[in-house]
From Swiss-Prot:
Family as reported in the entry's similarity comment: Belongs to the ABC transporter superfamily. Carbohydrate importer 2 (CUT2) (TC 3.A.1.2) family.
Molecular functions per Gene Ontology: ABC-type D-ribose transporter activity; ATP binding; ATP hydrolysis activity
Protein name (database record): Putative ribose/galactose/methyl galactoside import ATP-binding protein
Keyword Membrane: yes
PROSITE patterns with a match to the protein in the record: ABC_TRANSPORTER_1, ABC_TRANSPORTER_2, MGLA, RBSA
Species per Swiss-Prot/TrEMBL record: Paraburkholderia xenovorans (strain LB400)
Length: 504
């Protein structure tokens, strides 16, 4: 195979942070090369340098054997390097074709009017090459995330990309959508396109990757054949340490007092007659397929979505919760599945994010901020949760996903919430950070906190939950103890309503 990209002794630093040190990487034509590492390992920085988002400090990049310097994404696109970010870069109000050729739309003879027929025809041709059935005239905002991702791939291919960088491409996809994405990746691979595949999902490696390069703490560790290397070996290279397993402790949960009881809750089409109890010291797992209503239940209890009927009882007393402020006043915290949108102020620093939900506590004379007290509080939680940051004044956006998630947790711990909803707490974070989050959740339960964990990863649900509640199409279809819960039983309950509907 021909070498498309070769990186040698690459270095990159930001203020106070050494992001890359003497990194090497090679991508061959027609291969899927997985890039693995904990959050903060330097994967994203390396890919952004290859895509022209960042410039290197030193080192060498060869493209087709020739030295190159990408000063902007346009430079990278011009030679055929495309990147598909985890957060899709699309304009929802524009059509599929307009997004694919944005800024390069074909014009009429005078160059003034958009030639929509030619635009749609060119977009259709690219989609046909991918064997994707998608109307070029469809508005992107009306598409599923999976279909939007196909638009991003088509957009990259419109530049005749020979190198395609995919950052966590399956994070928001279901199994059928992942299978379709893999089909397209294999099609591109057969045409000689080199694909850099960044993911934290180990099970995907054996399915799609040819080789794996592992990074740790901004440095190159190893490149291995995916087929010949065990998942355990890759994890060991990623973290540089042995991950201790976290076993549920069921005795406390069985004996704990009821902290939260939800009775016959109705809130929109995805919360229908939902009832459950949550005990102090317990981790209650919520499982189900996408669209089952798990997030909607959490949002309704937290006051983020309106409740039509039902009761919410906190510590034995009926609670009136119409807004998130009401929920917080009753000691309920909610960590959203979209931490960047709903959990963090990414333009602010670490200490401001930690105290922001309880800012009144840090006011003097209801006006002046007690900066020293804020600094002490932030330092306490940075130490308690093991948040890796150069300082409490570091901008949150510069931290890894795992550390950002810990900051959101710190925010609710500072409010001293007794009931905590964790919605997809490990989404988009690496295996080492996941293990730290697991330890933290178990520690919180050990202190008597009542924890709800919503997760789409069944191994995570089975590993962490004292009990498992399963939902399908807005209703609870079953409850399993930790001893009873298996992937097969959970999936049976998660598809029960679909099965009944099909049988009918």
């Amino acid at each position: 195979m021909t070498s498309l990209i070769s990186v040698k002794r690459l270095n990159k630093s930001f203020p106070g942070v050494r992001a890359l040190h003497e990194v090497q990487f090679e991508l061959m034509a027609g291969e899927v090369h997985a890039l693995m590492g904990e959050n903060g390992a330097g994967k994203s920085t390396l890919m952004k340098i290859l895509a022209g988002v960042y410039t290197r400090d030193s080192g060498e990049i060869l493209y087709d054997g020739q030295p190159v310097e990408f000063l902007s994404p346009r430079d990278a696109q011009a030679v055929g390097v495309g990147i598909i970010h985890q957060e899709l870069q699309l304009m929802n109000h524009l059509t599929v074709a307009q997004n694919i050729f944005i800024g390069r739309e074909p014009r009429g003879r005078l160059g003034l009017l958009l030639d929509e027929d030619r635009l749609n025809a060119q977009a259709a041709a690219i989609l046909a090459r991918m064997h994707v059935s998608l109307d070029p005239r469809a508005v992107v905002g009306a598409l599923t995330v999976a279909r939007q991702q196909m638009v991003e791939i088509a957009k990259a291919l419109s530049f005749d990309s020979r190198v395609l960088i995919m950052d966590e491409p399956t994070s928001a996809l279901n199994d059928a959508e992942i299978a379709e994405l893999f089909r397209i990746i294999r099609e591109l691979k057969s045409r000689g396109v080199g694909i850099v595949y960044i993911s934290h999902k180990m099970d995907e490696l054996k399915q799609i990757a040819d080789r794996v390069t592992v990074m740790r703490d901004g440095e190159y560790v190893a490149t291995v054949a995916a087929r010949d290397t065990s998942v355990e070996a890759i994890i060991g290279m990623m973290v540089g340490r042995t991950l201790t397993d976290i076993a549920p402790s069921h005795s406390v949960a069985d004996q704990g007092e009821i902290a939260l009881e939800v009775r016959n809750l109705n809130a929109g089409p995805l919360v229908r007659d939902v009832s459950f109890a949550l005990r102090k010291g317990e981790i209650l797992g919520f499982a189900g397929l996408m669209g089952a209503g798990r997030t909607e239940v959490a949002r309704a209890v937290f006051g983020a979505d309106p409740v039509e009927s039902g009761e919410i009882v906190v510590n034995g007393a009926r609670a009136t919760i119409r807004t998130p402020s009401d929920a917080v006043a009753h000691g309920i915290g909610y960590l959203s599945e979209d931490r960047k949108r709903f959990g963090l102020a990414t333009g602010m620093d670490v200490e401001s994010n930690i105290v922001m939900s309880n800012l009144r506590k840090f006011l003097s004379l209801n006006f002046f901020l007690r900066r020293a007290q804020i600094r002490r509080t932030a330092s306490h939680f940075i130490s308690l949760l093991g948040i890796r940051t150069p300082s409490a004044t570091q901008a949150v956006r510069l931290l890894s996903g795992g550390n950002q998630q810990k900051i959101v947790i710190a925010k609710w711990l500072e409010r001293d919430c007794d009931v905590l909803f964790f919605d997809e707490p490990t989404r988009g974070i690496d295996v080492g950070a996941k293990n730290e989050i697991y330890k933290l959740l178990r520690s919180l339960a050990g202190e008597g906190k009542a924890v709800v964990m919503i997760s789409s990863e069944l191994p995570e649900i089975l590993r962490m939950s004292d009990r498992v509640i399963v939902m399908c199409e807005g209703r609870i279809t079953g409850e399993l103890s930790a001893a009873e819960a298996t992937q097969e039983r959970i999936m049976h309950l998660a598809t029960r309503r679909e099965t009944l509907k099909t049988a009918a």
